[in-house]
């Protein structure tokens, strides 16, 4: 059982190998505490998605394997469990790419997330109303096929489906990807509300570092399959390397293509 002192999610020095030969994660460690929003920052290919899949054990579906280290959730070692077992424990991953069941209506898509509730019709109905409370747009679109709704509505549907399973923690992979700035702000505001009001922990894998650090309490910067920097969000947002390489800022403010440098200051963690 997690407490304020012990993490709800503890990733300890994990290594992930694909196809028995491709080393993707190299000693990744991180903690997420109960009710915390933490973020994984990094460029495409840094290892963020693989880290989430290693935690949720979806990496096995892609011929990957956690070959070293451990993953603990709510005080239990889970890296040898199957993904459905983790869902029943309250660890839910929202995949990159806004996956929905295109042939189902929005409401039926949401209800697929309630399978762990079994025959608890009352609880399922209450959960559905809770989801509609956070995403009123989904209530309006409840009868529409998910294959014909907007990208923002698909993302809302994917998060809502995860909420139906009574999560203790949600792993969100690139929730801002492909969305207009106003929709990104709306999605992140709802993520914050879910965290505060429903006490759902969040681990966000996000290339949009500015948005992630705005809403997260703690962050981890990944590069080439390793965590190279971590700290509370405010400290990371003020870090010179994070500013230049992930926020697009320099000592004189935002970068302009007119003033683009023909060199980069070497990252301190590569020195």
Predicted segment positions?
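Glycine-rich phosphate-binding loops of nucleotide-dependent enzymes
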Residues: 2-271
């Amino acid at each position: 059982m997690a407490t304020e002192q012990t993490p709800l999610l503890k990733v300890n020095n994990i290594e992930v190998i694909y196809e028995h030969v491709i080393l993707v994660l190299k000693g990744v460690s991180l903690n997420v505490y109960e009710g915390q929003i933490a973020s994984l920052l990094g460029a495409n290919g840094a290892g963020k998605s693989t880290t989430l899949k290693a935690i949720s054990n979806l990496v096995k579906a892609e011929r990957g394997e956690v070959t070293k280290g451990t993953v603990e959730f709510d005080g239990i070692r889970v890296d040898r469990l199957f993904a459905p077992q983790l869902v029943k424990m309250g660890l839910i991953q929202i995949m990159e790419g806004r996956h929905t069941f295109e042939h189902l209506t929005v409401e039926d898509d949401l209800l697929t997330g309630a399978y762990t509730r079994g025959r608890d019709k009352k609880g399922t109905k209450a959960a559905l109303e809770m989801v509609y409370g956070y995403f009123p747009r989904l209530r309006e679109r409840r009868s529409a096929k998910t294959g014909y709704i907007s990208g923002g509505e698909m993302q809302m549907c994917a998060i809502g489906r995860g909420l139906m399973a009574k999560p203790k923690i949600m792993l969100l992979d690139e929730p801002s990807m492909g969305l207009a700035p106003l929709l990104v702000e709306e999605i992140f505001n709802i993520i914050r509300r879910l965290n505060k009001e429903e006490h759902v922990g969040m681990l966000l894998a996000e290339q949009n570092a500015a948005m992630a650090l705005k809403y997260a309490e703690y962050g981890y910067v990944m590069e080439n399959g390793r965590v190279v920097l971590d700290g509370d969000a405010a400290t990371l947002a003020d870090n010179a390397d994070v500013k230049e390489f992930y926020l697009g800022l320099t000592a004189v403010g935002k970068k302009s293509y007119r003033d683009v440098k023909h060199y980069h200051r070497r990252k301190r963690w590569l020195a």
